[in-house]
Amino acid sequence: MDNDIPEIKELIRQFSKLPGLGPKSAKRIILKLINNKENMIKPLAKSLAQVYKKVVRCEDCGNLKLIDRICICSSDNSYDKICVVENLADMWVIESANIFKGHYHILGGTMNSNENYEQKNLLIKSLIKRIKKNNLKEVIIATSATVEGQTTAHYIEDTIKNDKIKITKLAQGLPVGLSLIHI
């Protein structure tokens, strides 16, 4: 039997919006939280409130920053290349692999052929400004292999293409050793 307490139902509904969580998983999490109110709900609520109040998206690079501090993109100019990703999770994956040393630029999504970057609030104008301001030599476009990711990559490539900037994209295709019969 489901709970009739509206606050719990609403909490389950809100948790169900998170990626990878359905109503059943959300219920399990809520029950765990309720059974450990002092040790879990209070610190979680405090942390969420702090993030809501203090963390914002940098208008220049799309990374997260504290509202009262300058972003890392403003302070570190020792690199001459930039890696363009769709979202923060993509940047974290590349960063954790420790395979790239340079600037990051988080677009905030992708676009399809029916819309432009301004409609999607993508940070493409600020990317162009950063390339010029920091005299960057290479732009690595690390968008996904989806239609939207490739549409975005082509748009960026067409927008910034010139003789002085090397444009690189992530490798795509068949994994080494995979036979066509397995596709």
Report residues per predicted region.
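Conserved phosphate/pyrophosphate-binding and hydrolysis machinery centered on Walker-type P-loop NTPases
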Residues: 19, 38, 51, 117, ...
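Cys/His-rich Zn2+-binding cysteine-cluster or related metal-binding knuckle/ribbon modules and their
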Residues: 2-8, 17, 27-91
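Conserved beta-strand -> loop -> alpha-helix junction used to position metal-binding or nucleic-acid-contacting
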Residues: 166-176
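Short Gly/Thr/Asp-enriched flexible loops that form oxyanion-binding sites at enzyme active sites
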Residues: 148-161
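Extended interfacial segments that mediate partner engagement and assembly in macromolecular machines
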Residues: 26, 74-143
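Conserved small/polar residues in nucleotide/adenosyl-binding loops
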Residues: 181-183
